[in-house]
Regions:
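Residue-level signature of mid-helix packing/kink "hotspots" within the transmembrane helices
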Residues: 40, 68-76, 159-160
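Conserved MFS/SLC helix-loop-helix module at the cytosolic interface between two early adjacent transmembrane helices
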Residues: 73-112
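Extracytoplasmic gate region of multi-pass secondary transporters
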Residues: 42-43, 227-255
């Protein structure tokens, strides 16, 4: 089905034309829940990897570094690309990256392969987050704070549950049990296809009705925007700096 045909099919559909689309927000929230649940499993299994392979704390830190670089630093690049070239089904593609990374991590037998595995999982997160945030805004119907809060609740819930599941599944049964989390990635990838279809329909509706893309706010100077962005980046950096230290090493202290 091409864009024009899809645009004809959805003509007059209120869930596409406007208004808050709670079904899409809920799906995005669930997808964020599953994505962040899987992401939080990686640091939770560090004790297993250290015991099995005899890694030093420096090597554990490098695993975290590679994971964070691929899952965080790449996000602006994927977001920039998505702004210029929207890809409605990229959310499912991101989950497929996560799926591949999980399966690799479950069978990884060397340090290099573990680094590759966590990098692939991180890339999946980098692909998911910018587009998922965009979809949440598109489905908000102007209620952007509500939409973002639903999106964030899903992610925070997943981050909280992931370590508990890792303790219940991976710690008793070993590294191979990581593959069980692949079921969550598969479910999320299939579920997010629904979002991709809605996203395609939304783009088709905008094209059919010649709805212009949102324009940047010109009432605020570019210099002020950059300063505000810099402050936000520094605040978030400081938060995740100590968060990464806690998630990487505090588990060993508890043990």
């Amino acid at each position: 089905m091409n864009i024009k045909t899809l645009g004809n099919k959805i003509k007059g559909n209120p869930s596409v034309a406007g208004g808050t689309v709670f079904s899409i927000l809920i799906i995005i929230g669930i997808g964020h829940f599953l994505n962040d649940m899987i992401q939080s499993v990686v640091p939770s299994i560090y004790p297993i990897l250290k015991d099995k392979f005899g890694f030093s704390f420096a090597q554990i830190g490098i695993i975290t570094f590679v994971f964070q670089i691929s899952s965080s630093i790449l996000q602006p690049l994927t977001g920039l690309y998505a702004d210029r070239h929207p890809r409605p089904y990229s959310l499912s593609v991101g989950m497929c990256f996560t799926l591949v990374g999980l399966l690799l991590l479950a069978v990884a037998s060397s340090y290099a392969l573990i680094l590759l595995s966590v990098a692939v999982i991180g890339i999946g997160s980098s692909v998911f987050h910018p587009e998922a945030s965009r979809v949440a805004q598109m489905a908000s119907g102007g209620r952007k704070s509500l939409a973002q809060s639903i999106f964030q609740v899903g992610g925070n819930g997943g981050s909280a549950l992931g370590p508990l599941l890792a303790a219940a599944i991976v710690l008793p049964f070993g590294q191979g049990a990581i593959s069980w989390f692949a079921l969550a990635a598969i479910f999320a990838a299939v579920l997010l296809l629904r979002v991709g279809y809605w996203y395609s329909a939304r783009l088709a509706y905008q094209m059919r009705n010649n709805i212009p893309a949102p324009q940047p706010n010109t009432s605020i100077s570019r210099r002020r925007k950059y300063w505000a962005l810099l402050i936000l980046v520094l605040l978030i950096f400081s938060k995740y700096f100590y968060t990464a230290c806690m998630t990487s090493y505090f588990t060993f202290f508890l043990i």
